[in-house]
Amino acid sequence: MGAPGGRPPPLPSPWRPEQGGWVAAPPPAMACTAPAPPRALKMLSRRRALLLLLLLGSSLSLLLHRGAHLSWPPKSGAPACPSPAPGPKRMAVAFLKTHKTAGSTVQNILFRFAERHNLTVALPHPPCDHQFCYPRDFSARYVHPHTRPPAFIASHLRFRAAELHRLMPNDTVYVTILREPVAMFESLFTYYNQYCPAFRRVPNASLATFLEEPRAYYRPQEKYAMYAHNTLVYDLGGDNDHDPADATYLPGLIRQVEDAFALVMIAEYFDESLVLLRRLLNWDLDDVLYVKLNMRAPQSRGNGTAPGVAAQVRAWNALDAGLYAHFNATFWARINHAGRDCVEAEVQALRAARDRLVGTCFGGRPQPRPATQIRNKELRPWQPSAQVEIVGYDLPPGSGAPPDPRCLKLVMPEVQYSRYLLRKQSLRSRRRRGPPPPARPGPRLLPPRRSLLPKAT
């Protein structure tokens, strides 16, 4: 796993990085000593055998007379990690889904948890589509009445702490996710090329051309302009057009984010982020298993960003760059506090559990497919434009039986899952309210009385 410049140097660990993950490091070499004489070896072997018999007899005696249980020691090289504090799972979560940061995958994890535990998820009113009328500031008025009061919220919105606190339970845990600004901006430029006016103006849809003179294309007052400038700051409720030379603005925004969110995840270290999330919420490892969603096809991705272009992206999105640098550093401080060896061991356990789940659902690692090749329309991801292709997954053909709901939801895209939850929760809301009361009969209308006056002539 590569690390950006903000990652601290690695600590000594029984794990070492390899292509595709972490593997156990080899044990240290044993020092060589001269062989013992044969007679000494025989005496040593007898003593060892006698000692083993005594230990075995003592253990059996304890088991028979005291009902003791065997306690197996941890495997050699495994980190000694403290057990989490006992307590119930947290059942109220507000996730600020930022743009192009692996937020769709986090959202899917939260949707599945809420559905399994019969918890209400706040969903947008139909005029807002599957987002809470973004890019407007969030308002509780945008929440569908059949999804109130909610325990979870995880769809796109522009953060407003006061409105969310008014909507969500008092014990809600607030989390969000950030991504390295260069990779994020390249993804934004490709994904929203036909939506953001600043991107549409660029000749040949060239990111390098845009960055040569971004002010020539960018108009702050236009709809969807925020995709072209400091999008993370905008999503978090900040002023994405604030002068980065103001030395007081970014530290103030950082303090607000730290006060609002119990955890800021980092997309580049997604599995480590899920370990911290699981611990924060006191969830099980199975609660945070996932398959990557809303990915671009290889031909829709850039071939990497040249160093000069990367510097231009950071300069143009200076507020986002400063925000990410701060929370990347605090993220690794949390990892170190939790014990890096322990976190990496849990990452390995998470990946092994995920592999078992996808093996059960797909018979192996699922292969991303273009939407046109996915048979089940409920699994076809939304396509933002003809210029970019978003891939999804299809379940393997079965025996005609309905697909396993657990596997279906694991790869269900955001739009379809949101609509499914809205239908399900609307039905539940109507059942709770009961049938509508019968209509009250209106006043009885008498026929008009015949007039005794002569007709006008």
Label each region the model flagged:
Residues G2, A31-T457:
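Membrane-interface amphipathic segments in extracytoplasmic regions
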Residues G5-G6, G21:
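Small-residue-biased low-complexity repeat regions
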Residues G6-P8, P28:
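Intrinsic disorder/low-complexity segments
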Residues G20, P27-M30:
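Plant-biased recognition of short, low-complexity, intrinsically disordered N-terminal tails
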